[in-house]
Amino acid sequence: ESFTGLTSLRLNEGREFEEELASVEELLMEYEEAGIESPLIGFDFKKLLEEKHKEIVLKDELLRAVEEDRIIPFFQPIYDIKTGKANKFEVLMRIKQGDKYLPPFQYIQIAELFNMIESVDFIVISKALEYKKKIDANDEVELSVNISGLVLHDYKFLNKIVKKVDELNIKHSN
């Protein structure tokens, strides 16, 4: 007799962490009652569920940040040693939370995991371009923006960026 209960094990976003843990424990008991050795002996379900729960919490935080327009581009100057002037800026993503700005690393991972990275990258790029348009009347400042490798080869995404650059009358070289 085969036991297929394991295939239905997944973290449901609508359920509480404790419910998920209880579900796993119940599944393991069913294995034991059926006299089947669990292939999951030694696997730390609590840790896995804690990680998945954290991912969902971060995803919800990221969604709220998008909805509340709290994704902010930061501009890190890149100085020309010869002139001592910043002629380029690297655009970095931050998430505004109260009076603080959160670093993006874990949120970028979450955006990639939940297929939100295209939206997040485009928000950062759009805001950076709009700010550049306001402060750079002569269109001389160059921006360097890091985008996810997951969207780098997506022609629709790249065309959206080109369209935004054209809409703002910014030179493609900058």
Features from the language model and the residues they span:
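Conserved helix-loop-beta segment at the catalytic/binding core of cyclic-nucleotide signaling proteins
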Residues: 1-3
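Flexible, glycine/charge-rich interdomain/linker segments that couple
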Residues: 7-12, 30-57, 74, 140-147
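Catalytic core of bacterial c-di-GMP phosphodiesterases, primarily the EAL and HD-GYP domains
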Residues: 8-10, 14, 18-21, 85-88, ...
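Catalytic-core segments of nucleotide cyclases and related cyclic-nucleotide turnover enzymes
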Residues: 9-36, 56-59, 105, 158, ...
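Catalytic/regulatory signature loops of cyclic-dinucleotide turnover enzymes
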Residues: 20-45, 60-72, 132
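Nucleotide second-messenger and two-component phosphorelay signaling modules
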Residues: 34-35, 64, 68, 80, ...
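Active-site core of bacterial EAL-family cyclic-dinucleotide phosphodiesterase domains
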Residues: 44-110, 146
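Catalytic-site/binding-pocket detector for metal-dependent nucleotidyl cyclases
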Residues: 48, 115-116
